[in-house]
C-alpha cells in the first residue's frame, strides 16, 4: 500500500468516526518556525497533530517525550519541542510516560477506552491510576529488606549482591509512581 493510500484511508476512518476515535502519539512536538524541524509526508508533525486530533475523542501521549517533553525539550531546545498536551488543549490527553513506556500500560489504556467508552481514572499528571497509582517502592521485591533496615551501601557490596534495598545508593522508588515493579 502506498503512503498516499494509507493517508487517504486514515482520513476516511477519521471522518467516519468523528468524536469516537483516540489518537496515540509518540514523541514531543517541534513548534519553532511552525514546526518545520519535524515533518512527514510533506506536512509538519505539528500540523498533522492538529489535524488528526481535531475530531478525536481523546489523545494518548506515549513516552516521556510525548507526555512531558522529555530530552528534546531540555535546554537549549533548538526545535521548540513541547509535550502533546501543550498543543492539544481542547480534549482529554492521557500521559503514559516512560522511556520506554510500559507496553501493558499503553494496551491497557486503549483497551479500557474500547471496552468502556471512556478514559480510565487519571492522576494529577494525567496518567492512568491503574498503572501509575502506586509507588515502585510499594511493590518492590526489595521492600522486605527496606522494612528490616537492610540497605546496600554500594552497587557491588555484599548487601547489593544479596538483594538488599538500594535506597541508600540513590533509589527513587519511594517517590516514583509507575507499574514497572510489577510488569
What is each residue range found by the language model?
Residues 1-183:
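Iron-sulfur-associated redox domains of electron-transfer enzymes in respiratory
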